[in-house]
Amino acid sequence: MFRGIYETTIDAKGRTSLPAKFREVLVDVHGDDRFVITNSAPVDLGAGTFSSGLLIFPYAKWVEFEENFRSSKGLTSAQRNSIMRTIISPAVECCADKLGRLLIPPHLRKGAALERDILFVGVMDKIEVWSQAEREKVRIQDLKNFPSDSETVAELGL
């Protein structure tokens, strides 16, 4: 499982470092140092504004996602096309070098507004990548959407 939030930077050419803990999970848990990086689904911030980060999937999890997507029946044609254009088409297979460095392609950096200060956020079986400013906007939206009744939260074991 990917857990934790790690602050780092990205340079003008898109070079950054994947946190060591996340590299360990890729190899030790998923048995593969390859991963796929792509756009995340847009987060509706209200008033017609959206925020988007990036997602990093272990390679096997990405293949599983593609298989599930191909066999899914509950999507409209428009939803299917939107997911293909937003998430599947821009996806890039990557591998960090021995020092943990990776290169995030320009088309993904631009869509996620990654310029300097970024966050790697562990979310169970995937990793989110955010600009710090965009992540703060989404965090505020998450607080608004957080279950307000203690019963729902207690069911989760919190």
Curated annotation (Swiss-Prot):
One of its GO terms (molecular function) is DNA-binding transcription factor activity. One of its GO terms (cellular component) is cytoplasm. Keywords: Cytoplasm, DNA-binding, Repeat, Transcription, Transcription regulation. GO terms for biological process: negative regulation of DNA-templated transcription initiation. It is found in: Cytoplasm, Nucleoid. The keyword Lipid biosynthesis does not apply. Residues 5-52, 91-134 form the SpoVT-AbrB domain. It holds the Pfam family MraZ. Forms oligomers. HAMAP family: MraZ (MF_01008). Belongs to the MraZ family. This is Transcriptional regulator MraZ. It comes from Geobacter sulfurreducens (strain ATCC 51573 / DSM 12127 / PCA). The gene is mraZ.
